[in-house]
Amino acid sequence: MTKTADAIIIGAGVIGAATAFELNKLGYKTLSIDRNAEAGHGSTSGSCAIIRVHYSTLEGTAFAYEGYFYWRDWADYLGVKDERGLANYRETGCLVMKTSSN
């Protein structure tokens, strides 16, 4: 039996998993390859998982602001009914410090 994939994705962290998810939604068959036994157990697992919209460019800020709405409604975006296993999203606010060097 021969198995084929339309795309091979190296890495199954946040970027690789998101790429595979979006390609699958478009109908592509994907194969994800990662050095770890489970997805998200590389550098993604060490992330502090901060979602922010404060960036130095308008484009970066606009992109992050759009992403905020995906995170806020993550279960709906993924189309899951059972939220077990999903990343918890909690808004806590932030404090941005302005100094003479920034």
Predicted regions and their residues:
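Short, flexible hinge/linker loops that cap or flank conserved catalytic cores
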Residues: 1-2, 24, 89
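Accessory recognition modules or surfaces
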Residues: 2-8, 40-47, 51
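Dinucleotide-binding Rossmann-like beta1-alpha1 core, especially the glycine-rich loop
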Residues: 48-102
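Glycine-rich FAD pyrophosphate-binding loop
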Residues: 24-44
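Beta1/beta-strand and adjacent pyrophosphate-binding region of the FAD-binding site
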Residues: 1-15, 31
